[in-house]
């Protein structure tokens, strides 16, 4: 029997993601038309082009590097969401775990003078501990991980502000410049910066994040541990009756998820690309954007690499829109539309499954009708 391409999981994920992207860009274009029709076409092209807006190849390379620098932490947050989701958990607390990674890595670098490796390990441990708290509450107190995650997000945000106030600049609310205070805490460039017009921020974080995506795929798809995690996600009771430690799996999955988010924070702030604003009153969007990247990537670690780059590419491209025609927030609006539509990826996959099932049912009915007709004609021929 010919295989229906609409039943292929890979094809469904790819098509659903492409539909979300096209629809998001189209809605963004409509918004631009409503605000100022004269510059809508040029504005949406600017968003898509991002660093290609620059005419000089050297500038294009440099700002392409900046996009990759911001893609690495987004990818790590997406992997954090994906890992927990495979166990049937929705780790909305990834934003707080990311905050914990920021706080511990920057304090260790600026306040304690540690090198980049112990700073990153401390960020990983901070995210893991925070994730394990949600896991313990879920396993032993039946507290929904979404509720505990949201509460912890705000607690950790204000703890981060309090801790990093001790290492901020005197005349501004931002933390001190990492390269000026402790150069040993800056992630090594591995010579990659030279490939992007001597971009000082491009370095270890980019290849390391891709390696982590491959590692997550191997763990989930090729190991006994990954099989047990997914089995727990499909049916917790069935996993328990099969001898699997379902409570342990829940705790470990959220712990690993938190570790990935914390590592993502270190990948950004230990490059020196950004400084933390100690007066911030909102949780970083990186953790929430990771949700969109995970779903846009079809909940596949390898697909998430491309999805993370696309979301960051569009977000960065919005900054180049002509501010004389559109307000500064228009780039965030366009990015938000695309990110919002990423939530419909699973809905689109369900619609494609329904369509494929109906097509198969019609084909089966036609085959049975043709078979019945052939038998009837054969019977008539025998009677003659």
Walk through the language-model features, giving the residues of each:
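Cytosolic-side transmembrane-helix boundaries in multi-pass membrane proteins
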Residues: 1-21, 234, 241, 245-248, ...
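Membrane-interfacial amphipathic/re-entrant helices at transmembrane-helix boundaries
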Residues: 2-76
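Short loop segments and helix-boundary regions at transmembrane helix junctions
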Residues: 4-15, 85-92, 111-116, 120-182, ...
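Single transmembrane alpha-helix segments in multi-pass membrane proteins
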Residues: 32-37, 53-111, 124, 128-143, ...
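Transmembrane helix-bundle core of multi-pass membrane transporters
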Residues: 50, 57, 145, 153-222, ...
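Hydrophobic alpha-helical segments embedded in the membrane of multi-pass proteins
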Residues: 71-82, 97-103, 125-132, 154, ...
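Helix-loop-helix "hairpin" substructures at the membrane interface of multi-pass membrane proteins
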Residues: 129, 196-276, 302
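Transmembrane alpha-helical segments in multi-pass inner-membrane proteins
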Residues: 260-261, 270-336
């Amino acid at each position: 029997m010919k295989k229906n391409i609409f039943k292929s999981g890979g094809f469904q994920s790819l098509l659903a993601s492409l539909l979300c992207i096209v629809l998001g860009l189209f809605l963004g274009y409509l918004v631009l038309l409503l605000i100022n029709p004269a510059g809508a076409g040029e504005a949406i092209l600017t968003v898509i082009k991002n660093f290609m807006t620059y005419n000089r190849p050297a500038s294009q390379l440099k700002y392409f590097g900046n996009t990759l620098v911001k893609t690495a932490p987004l990818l790590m947050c997406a992997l954090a969401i994906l890992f927990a989701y495979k166990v049937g958990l929705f780790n909305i607390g990834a934003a707080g775990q990311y905050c914990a990674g920021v706080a511990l890595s920057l304090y260790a670098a600026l306040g304690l003078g540690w090198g980049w490796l112990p700073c990153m390990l401390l960020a990983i441990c901070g995210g893991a501990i925070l994730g394990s708290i949600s896991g313990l509450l879920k396993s032993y107190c039946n507290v929904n991980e979404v509720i505990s995650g949201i509460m912890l997000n705000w607690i950790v945000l204000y703890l981060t502000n309090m801790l990093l106030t001790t290492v901020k600049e005197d005349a501004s609310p931002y933390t001190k410049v990492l390269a000026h205070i402790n150069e040993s805490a800056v992630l090594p460039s591995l010579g990659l910066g030279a490939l992007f017009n001597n971009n000082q921020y491009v370095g270890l974080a980019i290849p390391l994040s891709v390696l982590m995506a491959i590692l997550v795929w191997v763990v989930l798809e090729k190991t006994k541990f990954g099989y047990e995690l997914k089995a727990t996600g499909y049916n917790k009771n069935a996993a328990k009756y099969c001898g699997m430690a379902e409570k342990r799996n829940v705790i470990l999955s959220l712990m690993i998820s938190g570790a990935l988010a914390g590592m993502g924070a270190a990948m950004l702030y230990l490059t020196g690309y950004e400084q933390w604003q100690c007066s911030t009153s909102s949780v970083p969007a990186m953790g929430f954007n990771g949700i969109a990247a995970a779903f846009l990537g079809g909940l596949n670690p390898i697909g998430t690499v491309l999805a993370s780059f696309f979301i960051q590419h569009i977000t960065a491209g919005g900054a180049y829109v002509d501010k004389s025609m559109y307000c500064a927030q228009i780039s965030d609006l366009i990015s938000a539309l695309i990110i919002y539509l990423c939530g419909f990826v699973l809905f689109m996959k369900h619609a494609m499954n329904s369509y494929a099932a109906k097509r198969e049912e019609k084909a089966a009915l036609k085959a049975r009708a043709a078979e019945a007709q052939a038998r009837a004609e054969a019977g008539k021929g025998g009677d003659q």
